[in-house]
Amino acid sequence: MKHLEKIKLIQGGMGVHVSNWRLARAVAMQRPGVTVGTVSGTALDIVYVRLLQLGDPGGHARRALRSLDEQFDVDIGRRICERYFIEGGKAPQDRFRSAPMQIVRAHDGRRTFPMPNGSAVTTPLKLDDEIIELLIATGFVEVWLAKEGHNGKIFINFLNKIELPLIYVLYGAMLAGVDGVIVGAGNPEGLPALCRRLATHEAVAHEISVLYRETGEEFVIAFDPKEIAGARFAAKPLETPVFLAIVSLEDLVKALAESPSAPPDGFIIEHHTAGGHNANPIGPLRRDARGQPIYSSRDEANLAAIRAVGIPFWLAGGYGSHARLQEALAAGANGVQVGTVFALAEESGMKPEYRSAILAALKDGVKDEDLVQTTVFSPTGFSFKVVQIQETLSDDDVYASRRRICDIGMLQQRGFGKPDEQGERTLFQRCPAGPIENFVKNRGLERNTDERRCLCNGLLACVGLGQVKEIQGEVVEEPAIVTLGNHLDGVRRLSRQGQTHYYVQDVIADILG
């Protein structure tokens, strides 16, 4: 854990493939040990299934999949390529073939469950083996590519709310030697200990949420690494990555520090001005005249209390400058985590047209508060920052004209229907951003679908991997959704008010000096 002490700048994990292996690798190579690159662990199965169908530009995915097969004497990578790779890429008008939906089942394949008899019961659930292999492989690929050819540190970021793929992608990342794990959007209790068990290939179980369960019922994703690929992955122990929990207030810091299983190795204290998902304001939701949620002093972290816990921490949310780094260090932090200014660097995975649109808005004098707004768009229920760009999902007309569909399902909720006459309950999966009738049919309230927008398809479109369809002879791509933090001063400074593009090395020099 000694390398944590040197880390001054962590590049944040962002969106779906915005903080991809290229960006993370560039950051990690700048000042090894001081700067850390972070890849996003979100939707990697979808990302690589689609990249392979685009012909795998540069051959990077296939190279990493070959390394997986050769290193562990498996044929998982070969089978993935056979299934999805298209030489020269698919035709622009052709739809992407879908990765398998992550449908959770009992270990015997059932999706119906009897009512419990009143005693406490833990039920293990799993995904299909094909999906598990794809998740492990793509977690490996992203980290392997990020770590290739240098000795810098690479972390991987997860949203705790995306529960089903987490432990499988994490295991794949660990097979590739990931140096650290960052988890936000929820309480990550139990995950630091789970990392340690995965390092020795032990069977693990991670609790997941299931709505309308009975008192005393618990459901877990259960995974035994030795049951995959003939136990070939389990031939020798792995390095245990450091674990950082993203939190907003000192209460969760104290609770996790006293974890009965294992505390995190560090914390990222994220202010509500950071991009992506944020904690909601404490207490009843109030809005200002512009419709933005009102945060108060109750939503500000007590840094003295966090410092007293004695575990390293980094500050995030508006810390993308040398002056703010110095403030963080003076407050007792080890350093800062920065996202927004990296998201607009040339190495990021954001589609160039959206980077250019944002820089053009800055050049035209659009104010930060008009360009980035806090919304209730996310199906998670967390606040979510959205950049206001025409012809994206930030546009109400675009949202209204898009047919609701849930064909990826990363943010689906799981729950039980009402028991039948035999006391059997069917496990459903639903999303507030999906078809309203399906949400209501599965015990949802229609009002909870208001303003909910499809982040899965929107964030994939943000990085040029949006699904396509043909409408009256015209190829139409899913509308994108773009997220940044509230503070764009670093972007303004480096781009000279939107007049020029910039690179990772410029960001590092600007923040670290």
State where each predicted segment sits.
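Hydrophobic residues within well-ordered alpha-helices
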Residues: V27, A328-L329
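Conserved active-site-proximal phosphate/metal-binding subdomains
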Residues: I10, A43-L44, R66, P264, ...
